[in-house]
Amino acid sequence: MSELTGEWKEVLSGEFKKPYYRSLYEFVKEEYSTHTVFPPADKIFEALHLTPLSKIKVVILGQDPYHTPGQAQGLAFSLPDDAPTQPSMRNILKELKDDLGIERTSQNLTNWAKQGVLLLNTSLTVEEGQPNGMADMWLPFTTRLIENLSKQDQTIIFVLWGKQAQKFAEFIDEKQPIISSA
């Protein structure tokens, strides 16, 4: 797993010392050495690398990375432009067009991340063909991350897409707006 720097390292450094995180780290390391896991190991924290904490305006929370080769990029819902369009991306593109009149052709959402949209999954890794298979291991870390985000001074809009993401509403401070949809 790649190292976090700056604001993220400061906010999460305490978590990295906790027993649950050591177990998570060892589990993920073992999974990468014995199975096909997505995204690539150097992209696990890509959402945090691309979106500085102080710049976050919106958190879009999904379930887990795409679980087939050549798709997961470390950003929830984002796909390489040459990848087959997945149902979730098809819905995003449709809603952009229908609701906002935006005709977006790129499936790569990196530009959103750089503009303050944290594209985060509740599980940051997934074994090939095993959707939500690593969710329990990631739950403590993702919970603490969401709690920390929701306690920031700035207003952050939390968009919870899917049943797994909606379970995280209870960890979001009441001062932060939540948009919850299936």
Predicted feature residues:
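A polyanion-binding, active-site-adjacent surface
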Residues: S2-E3, G14-L160, Q164-I172, I179-S181
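Short, contiguous pre-domain boundary segments
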Residues: T5-E10
